[in-house]
């Protein structure tokens, strides 16, 4: 009987093939932060297409100009005109894109998701406080390292808390063909999603933000070296002012043409 049941004799073959276990890469994939974005806008701030303002986000390199830049507003950058609102048409000011930088007399502004607390911040009566260490805002000449005196106020006419403009106003016009940096800390506000990603050193899905990651890191370092508290930074951006040639060049050309016709 046992001869008829060979399996009972323990003669089955043993598989001694080596089992190979593949190692799994457990390295976490880099986090990419999703940012609200619109083509033609500065996606550092989702509240308004042109904020913060003015900004290098709307400059492109151009080696034919004095500054090496050219203003680059898209067709949808400016808001819809009140008179053309029914047609949904944006304001078009093509001549601005001929400039080689931002106006030295421009308003400097941004907005946050709630109204900032300006307690202790320089106003029109305490402008000197804006130059003190620890002040919540800084306007810095990035070429000389000099702070620019200013005061801060919100738009008193605003009726939308999330759209309230914060103005940084200067006593004198800025220097032409010069890089400036702005920093805002504290104020009981929160950074935008994009700017928080910059602070955290994270990649975003917004190309215009990614194009400025290095320059913004350098800016944060510069305002920190100037004595600004960057541990509670809520917004920072930079811009380059236009050259005098770009600002008054058209007027000089008109004058020359008029004199030639006399």
Regions found by a protein language model. Give the residues of each.
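Secretory targeting signatures
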Residues: 1-14
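Intrinsically disordered, low-complexity repeat and linker tracts
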Residues: 12-24
């Amino acid at each position: 009987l046992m001869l008829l049941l060979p399996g009972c004799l323990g003669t089955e073959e043993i598989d001694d093939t080596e089992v190979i276990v593949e190692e799994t890469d457990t390295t976490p994939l880099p986090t990419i932060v999703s940012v609200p974005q619109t083509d033609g806008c500065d996606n550092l701030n989702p509240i308004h297409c042109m904020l913060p303002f003015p900004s290098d986000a709307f400059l492109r390199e151009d080696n034919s100009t004095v500054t090496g830049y050219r203003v680059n507003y898209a067709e949808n950058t400016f808001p819809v005109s009140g008179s053309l609102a029914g047609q949904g048409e944006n304001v078009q000011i093509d001549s601005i894109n001929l400039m080689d930088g931002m106006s030295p007399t421009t308003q400097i502004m941004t907005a946050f998701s709630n109204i900032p607390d300006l307690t202790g911040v320089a106003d029109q009566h305490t402008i000197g406080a804006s130059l003190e260490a620890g002040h919540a805002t800084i306007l810095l000449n990035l070429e000389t390292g000099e702070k620019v005196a200013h005061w801060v106020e919100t738009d008193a006419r605003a009726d939308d808390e999330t759209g309230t403009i914060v103005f940084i106003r200067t006593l004198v016009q800025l220097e032409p063909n010069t890089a400036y940096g702005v920093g805002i800390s504290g104020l009981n506000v929160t950074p935008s999603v994009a700017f928080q990603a910059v602070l955290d050193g994270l990649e975003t899905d917004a190309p215009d933000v990614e194009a400025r990651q290095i320059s913004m890191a350098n800016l944060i370092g510069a305002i920190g070296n100037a004595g600004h508290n960057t541990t509670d930074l809520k917004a920072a951006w930079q811009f380059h002012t236009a050259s005098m040639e770009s600002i008054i060049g058209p007027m000089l050309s008109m004058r020359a043409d008029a004199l030639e016709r006399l």
